[in-house]
């Protein structure tokens, strides 16, 4: 009987819950029969289709378009107008000082312009917990558009104002926007999605980063905005995604987990579940809502507390490793060689920007492929396989670059190697680290976890930009062996440590790490004062909420119904 009750409680995740949440009692008999019919006849494919509600799609697309898209766009948008921006720096300097700018000073100013984006990203990451606690996930994303719009106006007006400092400050502010976006957006998507599609929805972040990179490359073509007279408009375009998000996201609710566990607003949380999952699917979140019974008086964990907590030690280490490998795997270094490799392959210099679009296209297609298969293959194969393939192709690229003058067809192999590295990265390592950060931690730990992940991400980004020129100068084409080693090290670590998180609840993922951590979260510790024979040593969960009572009554009622049928 106990085994049967446990099984039916889990099967409740397939039954509709949302149409009647106004009272704590069980639903009517006729309704329960219909729901049990749904339990018996529901097909996995049908459930998967229902998971993708219109509201969920709009929230993910609007959230990503105004957030991760802008991050990707700002990674590539400065490449095409580089000569014109440097000329603008020189003209501004000469107008103020009466002499041309020194080449070393120009190089320094340009390096600051590019790298200050990462500094702003770090600042934005450190602001996440403070802003997110007050505003929540959705309103933090909305407020973040203020940074994007102000940065766009500064950068777009810098030429007209004759002040290159406006461009530098704008890049810094845009970095703040990116730091907040890459922490809050994955959190938001993770918390509004059912576990069956949490990976696919989380991959939207990476897909829109790639689309942003591709858009920056496309708009930077001379036929569009990549001309001397129009390059400021490349930065003005940033306003468009921000405005789209401001006009669409307010009509959607905040994260139901945030509303329930942090704001303790059960009515709004239930409505949020209904909006995102559809009324027939709200009960899919019952298993995750049960977490609220343990975390009713939730207190956000600080970064220092999370780093010290023994029961999440390996989760934290794994997030640090994956985020460090995400930036240190060498993808940014690939762009340094792209133009020269395309040139050696016989592509005319005027055509190289158009051929470079293929790299952005490969990025986008690989990210979309990952989003389509992640719930079938899982996180482990895509992440470990992605790093492993990158190590293999980096080794191949080292050989082809070393021998590229030996035969006319060798540079074409280098092009294939570059595209293969990009595809390997975007099919797994390009997005899954953000998904794992959201999946590894409970509600109270998640903001601190994203601060740690974001800090590692942006510091690693800055380190690559700072150190790669010296590595390249010292090792030349052999520099890619350094990145191959990093990728292989990451793949080996993840092979032995990373559990599969596909289709698992947050509690199940935490349990998967418990043996390795050799410690359990405080709420899982046994308290003999509140245990009895029925709970077998586990703490009895006391709930006073309307939602918990409703779920409890519903489970009992459906168990009785199933018992009568048998």
UniProtKB/Swiss-Prot annotation:
Residues 1-31, 524-543 are annotated as: Disordered. The modification Phosphoserine is found at residues 9, 514. Its main location: membrane. GO terms for biological process: dehydroascorbic acid transport; urate transport. It catalyses: urate(out) = urate(in). One of its GO terms (molecular function) is hexose transmembrane transporter activity. It is found in: Basolateral cell membrane; Apical cell membrane. Residues 1-51, 129-140, 193-200, 253-316, 376-381, 437-451, 500-566 are cytoplasmic. Pfam families: Sugar_tr (PF00083). It is a multi-pass membrane protein. GO terms for cellular component: apical plasma membrane; basolateral plasma membrane. Glycans are attached at residues 74, 90. Residues 73-107, 162-171, 222-231, 338-354, 403-415, 473-478 are extracellular. Residues 524-539 have a biased composition (Basic and acidic residues). This is Solute carrier family 2, facilitated glucose transporter member 9. It comes from Pongo abelii. The lineage of its organism: Eukaryota, Metazoa, Chordata, Craniata, Vertebrata.
């Amino acid at each position: 009987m106990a085994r049967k009750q446990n099984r039916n409680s889990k099967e409740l995740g397939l039954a509709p819950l949302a149409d009647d949440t106004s009272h704590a009692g069980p639903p009517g008999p006729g309704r329960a029969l219909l729901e049990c019919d749904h339990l018996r006849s529901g097909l996995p494919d049908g459930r998967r289709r229902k998971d993708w509600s219109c509201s969920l799609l709009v929230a993910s697309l609007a959230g990503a378009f105004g957030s991760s898209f802008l991050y990707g766009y700002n990674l590539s948008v400065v490449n095409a107008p580089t000569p014109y921006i440097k000329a603008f720096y020189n003209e501004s300097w000469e107008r103020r000082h009466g002499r041309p700018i020194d080449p070393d000073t120009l190089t320094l100013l340009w390096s600051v312009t590019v790298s200050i984006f990462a500094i702003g990203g770090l600042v934005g990451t450190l602001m996440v917990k403070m802003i997110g606690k007050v505003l929540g996930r959705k309103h933090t994303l909305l407020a973040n558009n203020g940074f994007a719009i102000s940065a766009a106006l500064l950068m777009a007006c810098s030429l007209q104002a004759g002040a290159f400092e406006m461009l530098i400050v704008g890049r810094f502010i845009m970095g703040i926007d990116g730091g907040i976006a890459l922490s809050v957006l994955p959190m938001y998507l993770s918390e509004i999605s059912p576990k069956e599609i949490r990976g696919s929805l989380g991959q939207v972040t990476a897909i829109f980063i790639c689309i942003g990179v591709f858009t920056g490359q496309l708009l930077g073509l001379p036929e569009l905005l990549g001309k001397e007279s129009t390059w400021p408009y490349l930065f003005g375009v940033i306003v468009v995604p921000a405005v789209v998000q401001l006009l669409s996201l307010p009509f959607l609710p905040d994260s139901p987990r945030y509303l329930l566990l942090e704001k303790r607003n059960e009515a709004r949380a239930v409505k949020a579940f209904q909006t995102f999952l559809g009324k027939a699917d709200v009960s899919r979140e019952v298993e995750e809502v049960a977490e609220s019974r343990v975390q009713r008086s939730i207190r956000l964990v600080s970064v220092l507390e999370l780093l010290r907590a023994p029961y999440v030690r390996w989760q934290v280490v794994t997030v640090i490793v994956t985020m460090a490998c995400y930036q240190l795997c060498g993808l940014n270094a690939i762009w340094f060689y792209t133009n020269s490799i395309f040139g050696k392959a016989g592509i005319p210099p005027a055509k190289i920007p158009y051929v470079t679009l293929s790299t952005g296209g490969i990025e986008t297609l690989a990210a979309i492929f990952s989003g389509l298969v992640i719930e079938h293959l899982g996180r482990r194969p895509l992440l470990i396989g992605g790093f492993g393939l990158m190590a293999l192709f980096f080794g191949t690229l080292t050989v082809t670059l070393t021998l590229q003058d030996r035969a006319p067809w060798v540079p074409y192999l280098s092009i294939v190697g570059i595209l293969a590295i990009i595809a390997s990265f975007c099919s797994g390592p390009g997005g899954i680290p953000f998904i794992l950060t959201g999946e590894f931690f409970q509600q109270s730990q998640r903001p601190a976890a994203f601060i740690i992940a974001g800090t590692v991400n942006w510091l690693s980004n800055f380190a690559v930009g700072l150190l790669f020129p010296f590595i390249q100068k010292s090792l030349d084409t052999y520099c890619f062996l350094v990145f191959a080693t990093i990728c292989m090290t990451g793949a080996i670590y993840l092979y032995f440590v990373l559990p599969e998180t596909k289709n698992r609840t947050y509690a199940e993922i935490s349990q998967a790490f418990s043996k390795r951590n050799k410690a359990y979260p405080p709420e899982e510790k046994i308290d003999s004062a509140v245990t009895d024979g029925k709970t077998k040593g586990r703490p009895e969960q006391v709930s006073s909420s309307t939602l918990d009572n409703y779920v409890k009554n519903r489970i009992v009622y459906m168990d009785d119904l199933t018992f009568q049928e048998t």
